[in-house]
Amino acid sequence: MTTTVGIAVKEGVVLATDKRVTAGYYIAHKQGEKIWKIDDHVAATMSGGVADLQSLLSFLTLRAREYKIEYKRPIPIRALVNYVSLILFYSRPYIYLVHSIIGGVDREEGAVLYMVDWLGTVTRERYIATGSGSPYAKGALEVGYREDMSLEDAVDLAIRSVKAAIRNDPGSGEGIDVVVITKEGFRRVFTAQQKIIITE
């Protein structure tokens, strides 16, 4: 149970998550990190089985590094999404319990956002929410999203969306993590109030 949000705008991609880690209705951790940096230009959110996601995202991180070494450029995000889709599809009937948002900026497609589910289904989205709090977050996204919004407005909308989920979903809480990915790279927004963006 969790809430993860992704928003793609012209300038880049915003990923936001809550920090509560649960096992059923047991709160296992209050400072969980649910955004996984795959490379400087791409990251993923974690919703579902933690061990399954860590395994898959570790593989994608390794594959991205191998690609960069071999081809001297960052891996296209669509290639990463295709890898994870094939792994999930061909793991049947022993499915990975995962639901992830993969987003970033590459030279092939610009700012892109994909949703991948446990069966290997891939959809390209402008905005998306996953996890138990997603109905509440998606409502805020539907009302607030505009195609011409700035990156700063997208950060504000992502924060509002996760806050809406935290207010209504017992599986979400303990704070919000926000990441921004632009052509300059991966940046973590440390405090929503100050809008301080620090390069990682």
Swiss-Prot record:
Q: Which ranges does the record mark as transmembrane?
A: none
InterPro entries, per the entry: Ntn_hydrolases_N, Pept_T1A_Psome_bsu_arc, Pept_T1A_subB, Proteasome_bsu_CS, Proteasome_sua/b, Proteasome_suB-type
Which EC class does it fall in?
A: hydrolase
Primary subcellular site in the record, as a coarse category: cytoplasm
Q: Name one GO molecular function term.
A: threonine-type endopeptidase activity
Short name of any one Pfam family annotated for the protein: Proteasome
Q: Which residues form the propeptide?
A: 1
State the UniProt keywords alphabetically: Autocatalytic cleavage, Cytoplasm, Hydrolase, Protease, Proteasome, Threonine protease, Zymogen
Please indicate which superkingdom the organism of origin belongs to. Answer: Archaea
Which cellular component terms (GO) are annotated to the entry? cytoplasm; proteasome core complex, beta-subunit complex
Catalytic activity from the UniProt record: Cleavage of peptide bonds with very broad specificity
Note the Gene3D superfamilies from the entry: Glutamine Phosphoribosylpyrophosphate, subunit 1, domain 1
* Active-site residues, record numbering mapped to chain: T2
Q: What is its EC number?
A: 3.4.25.1
Question: Where found, per UniProt?
Answer: Cytoplasm
HAMAP family annotated for this entry?
Proteasome_B_A
**PANTHER family from the xrefs?**
ATP-DEPENDENT PROTEASE SUBUNIT HSLV (PTHR32194:SF0), METALLOPROTEASE TLDD (PTHR32194)
Give the family per the record.
Belongs to the peptidase T1B family.
Please explain the role this protein plays, according to its UniProt record.
Answer: Component of the proteasome core, a large protease complex with broad specificity involved in protein degradation.
The name of this protein is Proteasome subunit beta 2
